[in-house]
Amino acid sequence: MSYQPSLRAMTAKTYGNHSRIEGGDVKGLNVLLLEDHISTGLSCLDAIRALREEGAEVTQVMSITNYAIPETMRLFEEQSIQTYDVIRFDRVVKKACEMGVINDEQAALVMEWLNTPWTWAAMHGVVAIAREN
């Protein structure tokens, strides 16, 4: 198994080949995108779009942590992207509850936010500035 590391940039460089992709040509390569964290997924999906525009095949993303917000997961499904993660946030909440860091009521509130963050924010008087992570 061989691989060629390629890094992504949020915006195209203003010099050189003006590419968002560094580390070599990705055309025709099957790319596994690695992320530290997925919240809304928008920056990750933007990177996938950039890689696909350069000819890469991207069908999988792996992250260390993932909120796994239902709306976010639907966005990945719509793009035929399978997500893998080391730790989902619901496990963090469960462990915090087990350790006594938060109680059951607090855990339920966090999980309510996690399942519908924008609706939850509106219901609790929080103004969501953007849906970007």
State each model region's role.
Residues 49-133:
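PRPP-dependent phosphoribosyltransferase catalytic core
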Residues 1-32, 40-46:
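Short, glycine/charge-rich flexible loops or terminal/linker lids adjacent to PRPP-binding catalytic cores
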